[in-house]
């Protein structure tokens, strides 16, 4: 599923991401834009053999199990396939686990490079939330 910007903002808010660990909703919508273009089916192979999955491009080396990444940790305790569902509940649950890990949203390279330190409120502007 490819979410509309405001539709995604509303879903993320409903699932408790607004100000989760101090990150406003705009940060999450911005990250999703640059990670997946709001597409839950997005996948991306990395040079280390791991794959990133879903709307927030969550990585199989650390966070989910795809059955083929060597030495995978699966810290979210989920198969990576659930991160590709239209329903983003599991992706958000895992994202909360990731952002609580000490490095915050810096875990997402796209957030670090494109969202951090910018006016992320523009990502939710005009949305009825």
From Swiss-Prot:
The keyword Hydrolase applies. It comes from the Eukaryota. Disulfide bonds join 6-127, 30-115, 64-80, 76-94. GO terms for molecular function: lysozyme activity. It holds the Pfam family Lys. The keyword Hydrolase applies. GO terms for biological process: defense response to Gram-negative bacterium; defense response to Gram-positive bacterium; killing of cells of another organism. Residues 1-129 form the C-type lysozyme domain. Its EC number is 3.2.1.17. The active site is at residues 35, 52. Lysozymes have primarily a bacteriolytic function; those in tissues and body fluids are associated with the monocyte-macrophage system and enhance the activity of immunoagents. Lysozyme C is capable of both hydrolysis and transglycosylation; it also shows a slight esterase activity. It acts rapidly on both peptide-substituted and unsubstituted peptidoglycan, and slowly on chitin oligosaccharides. This is Lysozyme C-3.
